[in-house]
Amino acid sequence: MSGGDGIPTFKLVLVGDGGTGKTTFVKRHLTGEFEKKYVATLGVEVHPLVFHTNRGQIRFNVWDTAGQEKFGGLRDGYYIQGQCAIIMFDVTARVTYKNVPNWHRDLARVCENIPIVLCGNKVDVKDRKVKAKTITFHRKKNLQYYDISAKSNYNFEKPFLWLARKLLGDPNLEFVAMPALAPPEVQMDPAMIAEYEKDLDNAAKADLPDDDDDL
């Protein structure tokens, strides 16, 4: 699917509990923030996020709920024709991870078999509650997972690169230049990053629990 300018363009549905940092995350991409459009009928902001790859440009039209999820579920119109998705939770609030299966169920009901990335946001906050070893939902449902920190730009591009590779069917796709991002509001401690990356590696090798105690 191309935009009018020939750039491959995909609808990306961004979901997760209110307050997990979805809007903060999408606003990091400065041109997308500048060019966003408001869809009044659905009460949604659509941010066109363009990335430069070794195969040319790719655009994600990221649909952001503008906080409607605080009032219950989202209308089907939000999901319809979604081609990929990011489910976000807050690693400092366990309840937001507990609700991930509900968001996944809503997505899967309307958008069958689309590539989905699960993101644990706010890993810059020292008091992390949802640890790597308890994050197993993505392994059960064949999703990709990334720790992210919207406010520090940590791993900002990772979900988009993984989705771009899936959507374009090219596992060797690379981003050749980073988009202009808002300056970091916080700095990630390199030692903490190294520790979290090691924790995720170890968690990926661990056996999955038989039950759903992690949810």
Swiss-Prot record:
Superkingdom field: Eukaryota
Family indicated by similarity: Belongs to the small GTPase superfamily. Ran family.
Subcellular compartments: Nucleus; Chromosome, Centromere, Kinetochore; Chromosome
Subunit description: Found in a nuclear export complex with RanGTP, exportin and pre-miRNA.
Residue ranges annotated for the Small GTPase Ran-type domain, each copy included: 6-170
Residue ranges, annotated region (Switch-I): 36-44
Protein name in the entry: GTP-binding nuclear protein ran-1
GO molecular function term, any single one: GTPase activity
Keywords on record: Cell cycle, Cell division, Centromere, Chromosome, GTP-binding, Kinetochore, Mitosis, Nucleotide-binding, Nucleus, Protein transport, Transport
Database matches in InterPro entries: P-loop_NTPase, Ran_GTPase, Small_GTP-bd, Small_GTPase
Record's function text: Ran GTPase system comprises ran-1, ran-2 and ran-3 and is essential in nucleocytoplasmic transport. Ran-1 is a GTP-binding protein that mediates the interaction between mitotic chromosomes and kinetochore microtubules. Plays a crucial role in nuclear envelope assembly at the end of each cell division. Required for the import of protein into the nucleus and also for RNA export. RCC1 (ran-3)/Ran (ran-1) complex (together with other proteins) acts as a component of a signal transmission pathway that detects unreplicated DNA.
Coiled coil: none
Gene Ontology, cellular component aspect: cytoplasm; kinetochore; nucleus
Region listing for Switch-II, in residue ranges: 67-83
Miscellaneous information on this protein: Loss of ran-1 results in failure of correct attachment of kinetochore microtubules to mitotic chromosomes and the resultant loss of correct chromosome segregation. The number and the location of centrosomes are normal, and astral microtubules also seem unaffected. Nuclear envelope is not reestablished at the end of each cell division.
UniProt lineage: Eukaryota, Metazoa, Ecdysozoa, Nematoda, Chromadorea
Cell division in keyword set: yes
Record GO biological process: cell division; embryo development ending in birth or egg hatching; oogenesis; protein import into nucleus; ribosomal subunit export from nucleus
Binding site for GTP: 17-24, 67, 121-124, 149-151
A Pfam family of this chain: Ras
Matching SMART domains: RAB, RAN, RAS, RHO
